Amino acid sequence: MTGVSHFSRVSKRVAALNPPHLRAIFSPYGWTDMYRDLYYHGGIFNHGFMSHWVKSNGPHFRTRNTLKEKWGEARYGQAIKAALGDPEISAVPYLVDALSHPDDGANSMLVDIIVNNLCNEFHRERSVNFENCKIPAYFGGDWGLYGLHLPGDIRAIEKWKGPKKLTIGPPVYLDRPLYQYAYESLRWFDHWLKGIDTGILEEPPIHLFIVGANEWRGAEEWPLPETKWTPFYLHAGGLLSEHEFWPQDGSSSYEDSPHHHGEIEFKTPPLVENTEICGPIVLNLFGSTTAMEILWFVSLWHFDAKGHGSLLTRGWLRGSQRKLDPAASRPWQPFHQHTEREPLEPNKIYEFNIEVRPYGIQLKQGERIGIKIKSADNDPANNYLELVGIGHVSSDSASTVTIQHNADYASHLLLPITKGNRIGTFISGGNLPPVKRP
């Protein structure tokens, strides 16, 4: 079996059943967790992709209303009524129209996702079950599809139990039918279907394209074994550095409302050496809000020596769904339960562990890494890949959001440093102190 996107997801789900006549799959670009990868990023509903996809199929595209059949008219109607009463949903006209006309076109697909806003059986039964998957599998993607397929293929390489390979390429949109992977797929299938020695299993199981260096590197496992997990702490004045805190550090705030979405930016000093960042990323924040809910939208940026910024990847988290699954979480990879919402107490400080989707980049001397934090994704997209990562709901009420960064609450960005910073030189900024002459 082979294919990308929907076909990749189907291939993975079929292969996970270990059918005796399936020899191998070549299935890059395919999400594996319907809730986390696609529709509810960090528990925040992402309607942008689904709305675009439904519209692109035309007005005559229809789907069977399986959820209505399963639940019955009464329960289905109550769920729709509750969704229409959610201010985040009712603020989006397209979603209101779909909920008001659930039997029109493909609206039932959208309604099913809206009314199942927690990670429940609806999402799990449509995701990949990794418990006993032994079929040889080839996964892949690119750094730019962080809002759709990237996390699914990385999860697959970690959890798949049979022979496996992974290729993560540069952030570009590949042409259909993905002819760029044709030669690699032939090598994979020639080995498993024809017994031809193509040499593909003698190569490292993982190949990653490093942006900036513009070259490929091999790896034996994910995350990379040589990773130096380095915390970069948030400071007053928008500084991001390895220094844990200074006496003057306190907190930073921004205002958020339907009419104005404020933000805070933190950047490192210019790096003093070429530095490679490759792997999972997490932002551990201590923060509060004047409201009972907060939506965290985090973006990771690269700034060149002239100060021009480029978006790399994003992370999200609904504050009321901050509860972690301790067994599935790692320091570099928080895994949230998303099974219930626990409203926040206004002005109370909470810890939020925000997964930022992985990336691989080499930063040159004099360049910077930075983050932007806000409570909406209203910034326009520059390309299709960025477009897939936006389109979420936002809060309907005004609030003040405060981020703590001090000795008591050391908010920090945990970065996977795979080259450079051997003795911790980021903090100097590369500036030599001047000599005072008499």
Describe every region a protein language model picked out:
Residues 3-13:
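Glycine-rich nucleophile elbow surrounding the catalytic serine of serine-hydrolase chemistry
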Residues 146-152:
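Conserved alpha/beta-hydrolase "acid-adjacent" motif
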Residues 16-18, 23-132:
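Accessory cap/linker subdomain of secreted extracellular hydrolases
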Residues 1-3, 28:
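Short beta-strand immediately N-terminal to the catalytic nucleophile in serine-hydrolase-like folds
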